[in-house]
């Protein structure tokens, strides 16, 4: 949609969460290793809300407790410890993580805290075994430069990452504690972003600065973006868990569409004098003989069917608020999250799903549903049905007031779904088990004297020093292999840097697309490949096959891989001899086509010599020998 975002008063702020690539976790000596093998054990917990010192209970925490969920935590004996399981106090903060936080703060022009105090931030979804996350305020009031102008950075915090979610059931959530405690930077911007494109550019720039340090983890799940979005007459919506940079634009666009649509629905409902009836009616007896599979299944499991009446809502529940999502979807999200039900039916979409027209007529009569009214029904266990319908009643009332402030989950299609209300602001408490950290001027001076080269500077240098074209230089600057590239290019000056860069950026990706596990490759393997190339043990055409050989035989050395693959570097004399044989074997074609036989002969030469001789040598030798025959 082409909106006038300035007229709409769009304001967007980002929260970037980036894992740091440290040797140990933030509060213990466990490695920062994510595992997918079978865990060694599990524990179960139930978290309950408690009053603050002021006598208040956080509304998000209270809401979470109403779900009556238990939390299951998987652990490993050799890479996790009692700190993650909240059975041992936290150790001192990892110094490496603090140094990286100060470095990033300097690169973003932040004002540093004199002293870093570890705080406890309430976490209500079970993703931390203790019920809170340890976090440290490091710096404030900085900015980043973008093509759209400067964007303020409110704060940078150093905190522990949450558990990794494994499974989400109706009455339980299963986590693994291997990710819990990995150092994480939380970078929060001011709401200075005024368009979707600007939002994407801001996130890209922050990511660029983080990667420039060389001290952050790479790959899916290592960086997560939360996006706060609002427009005039709307509400602040926090969208959690945007993992793909390219999705940020669409998330912002679709949330603007959603808020505009919900405001239009509100105006229409007010015109109609719409009313939400609080009464929940039992319609189990009315639909006991239904052929609807969903309703029959609920009744078979000793469930009930109940319904509510929404006066003036006819046609509104089925109205689209985001691409493919309707007001009814908003109601359904609330019912699913707060009631634990699978979904709901509403009369805007009936008859359907096995519910007949006759049953709809009976339902409307029973509920006293007029022409402009709508009915919502839910089938499940009695307590779940009532929780779900009460949640829908609340959401329906909100639709006549405006847009509720919510935390929503980012979906893969650029839409969002309900997670929970926005949490209260005062969720931070001092951590009494970890001493404070004093930030001295000497420490800051050391950080300032060791800042990394920024990507834009590195790009110019790569083009000038290594003669990479601009596109390849851009890829290399942003690559996980950037340090390895520089090391190999300096170590093996005989090899063109372009070949090293394309191998690291293109060849490895092509091999991965073929289904081979490039993860088993080490820097030592790649060093052996280019060492062999520089010593003329192999040709550059052999590089992909040699890399595949290392993937298939990671314990072998280069000579062993070359032997397995049947590759060795031939002398010029050997190449000339083989090419002469190929020409003689195809002499009738040579006599008929002359130099026009070059293409056919080149193909046959490469089939026999690929991997054993340089392609350029093969080409020049063939041309020379063919001319001799033709003349």
Curated annotation (Swiss-Prot):
Sum up the protein's function in the record's words: Allows the formation of correctly charged Gln-tRNA(Gln) through the transamidation of misacylated Glu-tRNA(Gln) in organisms which lack glutaminyl-tRNA synthetase. The reaction takes place in the presence of glutamine and ATP through an activated gamma-phospho-Glu-tRNA(Gln). The GatDE system is specific for glutamate and does not act on aspartate.
Any Gene Ontology CC annotation: cytoplasm
> Which gene holds the coding sequence for this protein?
gatE
Query: Which EC number(s) does UniProt give?
Result: 6.3.5.-
| Family matches, as SMART domains | GatB_Yqey (SM00845)
Quaternary structure note: Heterodimer of GatD and GatE.
Q: What is the lineage of its organism?
A: Archaea, Methanobacteriati, Methanobacteriota, Methanomada group, Methanococci
Q: Which UniProt keywords apply?
A: ATP-binding, Ligase, Nucleotide-binding, Protein biosynthesis
Cross-referenced InterPro entries: Asn/Gln-tRNA_amidoTrfase_suB/E (IPR017959), Asn/Gln-tRNA_Trfase_suB/E_cat (IPR006075), Asn/Gln_amidotransferase (IPR018027), Asn/Gln_tRNA_amidoTrase-B-like (IPR003789), GAD-like_sf (IPR004115), GAD_dom (IPR029351), GatB_C_1 (IPR042114), GatB_Yqey_C_2 (IPR023168)
Query: What is the official name of this protein in its record?
Result: Glutamyl-tRNA(Gln) amidotransferase subunit E
A single Gene Ontology biological process assigned to it is: glutaminyl-tRNAGln biosynthesis via transamidation
Which Pfam families does its entry note? GAD, GatB_N, GatB_Yqey
ATP-binding as UniProt keyword: yes
